[in-house]
Amino acid sequence: MDDYTQSINDAVKCLRQGGVIAYPTEAVYGLGCDPFNHDAVAQLLTIKKRSIKKGFILIASEWKQVEPLTEPIDPKALARVFDTWPGPFTWTFPASKEAPHWITGQHSTIAIRVTAHPLAKLLCQRFAGPLISSSANQEGGPPIRDVKILRLVFGNKIDKILEGPLGPTHRPTPIRDAITGEILRL
């Protein structure tokens, strides 16, 4: 990870200044920003041509970064979630009052993944908090796995690209309900 130290530091600086970045994840390039910066989230919505009603996934390097954004759930259900993390699995939790409405959208839940991707995890660690993780595509388009295509599609609309290898998964992560285990997206 030493090869990426400067790039990660630059990405963190960009995030703290309210920028929108692209970064590698378990499956595809993700677009993200500080989830607590409303202006940055508004910019991301514009870039993706996405409705605020849909909500966003948050990634974190560890559970404690996102736990305050969730309401407590049954310990057995939480154990089932923890069995899949860190890893390419996104779970929806009942959202707490701490979860910004521009992250949850029209939902009463918040979607969270504790990432196993080394660069995404390090990015969250250095940022000291969760990040929005939305597939690098415009609404309805295919997710991007190639940095050259990422540059062609988004050009100067994003503030920083953190280049790096993608994870071994070739599709966006599945989403499941943390309480019921129901699959919401495969």
From Swiss-Prot:
It holds the Pfam family Sua5_yciO_yrdC. This is Threonylcarbamoyl-AMP synthase. It comes from the Bacteria. Gene3D superfamilies: DHBP synthase. PROSITE patterns: YRDC. Its main location: cytoplasm. PANTHER family: SUA5, THREONYLCARBAMOYL-AMP SYNTHASE. GO terms for molecular function: ATP binding; double-stranded RNA binding; L-threonylcarbamoyladenylate synthase; tRNA binding. InterPro entries: DHBP_synth_RibB-like_a/b_dom (IPR017945), Sua5-like_dom (IPR006070), TC-AMP_synthase (IPR023535), TC-AMP_synthase_SUA5 (IPR050156). It is found in: Cytoplasm. Required for the formation of a threonylcarbamoyl group on adenosine at position 37 (t(6)A37) in tRNAs that read codons beginning with adenine. Catalyzes the conversion of L-threonine, HCO(3)(-)/CO(2) and ATP to give threonylcarbamoyl-AMP (TC-AMP) as the acyladenylate intermediate, with the release of diphosphate.
